[in-house]
Amino acid sequence: MSCTLLKGVCTMKFLMMIVFLQVSACGAAPMNDSEFAEWYLSRFYDYGKDRIPMTKTKTNRNFLKEKLQEMQQFFGLEATGQLDNSTLAIMHIPRCGVPDVQHLRAVPQRSRWMKRYLTYRIYNYTPDMKREDVDYIFQKAFQVWSDVTPLRFRKLHKDEADIMILFAFGAHGDFNYFDGKGGTLAHAFYPGPGIQGDAHFDEAETWTKSFQGTNLFLVAVHELGHSLGLQHSNNPKSIMYPTYRYLNPSTFRLSADDIRNIQSLYGAPVKPPSLTKPSSPPSTFCHQSLSFDAVTTVGEKIFFFKDWFFWWKLPGSPATNITSISSIWPSIPSGIQAAYEIESRNQLFLFKDEKYWLINNLVPEPHYPRSIYSLGFSASVKKVDAAVFDPLRQKVYFFVDKHYWRYDVRQELMDPAYPKLISTHFPGIKPKIDAVLYFKRHYYIFQGAYQLEYDPLFRRVTKTLKSTSWFGC
């Protein structure tokens, strides 16, 4: 019998064992303080009455006291070896299910992935939150680690990924059962094949994106740290500290220790190409008939593509810079026909004819270009005239001749019932469109030497401008 819940194969006998474990765990009698402390030390500090020493040693050692001292030292408590109130209080704080001390025979030292490009898949979703919120939270959690390393992550919607993400109750097939609300919140496995690298979250918790309940983003960043090879830290400022505490996700930053530890495994991020070398624009800079092939934001800048080069500038700045496409991205061809950015992911997509390229943090991704037909276009489409990403709707609009297509970024699928006529659904806009820019909740639709400022909320054109107005011409 195949098992799709976890990587690998499980038998009926194994499933029955899982059920038995879950019933046993749920039906266990409440523990007193001493029993709870022994359970805690057994689970997180490798304590066990039947532990066989790896080396010859005295048989009258007090292993329980030694493990209590080890736990107290880890959390910065006075290492008395006594089960006092401060020690018990720490033990009762909700925490990660990964041990603080790894047994020498159980975990390879400095486990890491031996590749830069990793895949992940959210196997199922918690009912506590909207599906799109869960997708966004994990995308941001992975970005926390990709921002400080050369690692890159890609989401899969089917098949087995390097990192499988699962929400589950109680016993769920890995002999590391969840204990209900509070207690252990989640656990993850160090890098490797099979279940290694996976992250599991206790569905008994109330997962949220705020300070109420348990904040999914904070726990996800922590567990993905394990999935990438990090162990627990005894630094309370580290996201890899074992116990849970709320931090504001909008201002969250990795500690210096976290950055140093993850970079000791994977190195620093690949330095993006420099865009700080301005040069004088050509004489056609403010030509009255100047048009653009593609226009998009790239971070805080705006890129204006034309033939083999592009202008770039900061909105509001008098300076305008120009450089050749090949000087920044030697693998990208000239004559880009459409472009859009997903700023939250630091991703730039470039289109020419039947192919498209992905630029991640200004670095071209391998295994590109890809076919535009993989996005869901029909065979009749031979090129994309213009494209724009609307962050409020999380949709990409592709303009092709008299029609437009709409692509769902979260689902990574073309929306059904498309294409539709541009003139019908964008009143005041007539084909053909050269480029589209999203800026301050408006679309700027470039057609030859002019651009139309379009309000997508009220579906109307609000201004007509020269295409070169961005340059102060």
From Swiss-Prot:
Purpose of the protein: May be involved in tissue injury and remodeling. Has significant elastolytic activity. Can accept large and small amino acids at the P1' site, but has a preference for leucine. Aromatic or hydrophobic residues are preferred at the P1 site, with small hydrophobic residues (preferably alanine) occupying P3.
Binding site for Ca(2+) 2: D162, G194, D198
Biological process annotations from GO: bronchiole development; cellular response to virus; elastin catabolic process; lung alveolus development; negative regulation of endothelial cell-matrix adhesion via fibronectin; negative regulation of transcription by RNA polymerase II; negative regulation of type I interferon-mediated signaling pathway; positive regulation of epithelial cell proliferation involved in wound healing
Binding residue positions for Ca(2+) 1: D128, E203, E205
Motif (Cysteine switch): 94-101
Amino acids binding Ca(2+) 3: D179, G180, G182, T184, D202, E205
UniProt cofactor(s): Ca(2+); Zn(2+)
Gene3D superfamilies reported in the protein's UniProt record: Collagenase (Catalytic Domain), Hemopexin-like domain
Cysteines joined through disulfide linkages: C286-C473
Enzyme Commission code: 3.4.24.65
Positions annotated to bind Zn(2+) 2: C96, H222, H226, H232
Annotated residues for binding of Ca(2+) 4: D293, D385, D434
Source organism (scientific name): Mus musculus
Coiled-coil residue spans: none
Entry keywords, A to Z: Calcium, Disulfide bond, Extracellular matrix, Glycoprotein, Hydrolase, Metal-binding, Metalloprotease, Protease, Repeat, Secreted, Signal, Zinc, Zymogen
Signal sequence bounds: 1-28
GO MF annotation, one: zinc ion binding
Alphabetized PROSITE patterns for the sequence: CYSTEINE_SWITCH, HEMOPEXIN, HEMOPEXIN_2, ZINC_PROTEASE
Textual note on the cofactor: Binds 4 Ca(2+) ions per subunit.
Compartments, record wording: Secreted, Extracellular space, Extracellular matrix
Species lineage: Eukaryota, Metazoa, Chordata, Craniata, Vertebrata
Glycosylation sites: N32, N85, N321
Protein name: Macrophage metalloelastase
InterPro entries found in the cross-reference section: Hemopexin-like_dom (IPR000585), Hemopexin-like_dom_sf (IPR036375), Hemopexin-like_repeat (IPR018487), Hemopexin_CS (IPR018486), M10A_MMP (IPR033739), MetalloPept_cat_dom_sf (IPR024079), Pept_M10_metallopeptidase (IPR001818), Pept_M10A (IPR021190)
Propeptide: 29-109
Broad EC category: hydrolase
Catalytic activity: Hydrolysis of soluble and insoluble elastin. Specific cleavages are also produced at 14-Ala-|-Leu-15 and 16-Tyr-|-Leu-17 in the B chain of insulin
Start and stop residues of the Hemopexin repeats: 289-332, 333-379, 381-429, 430-473
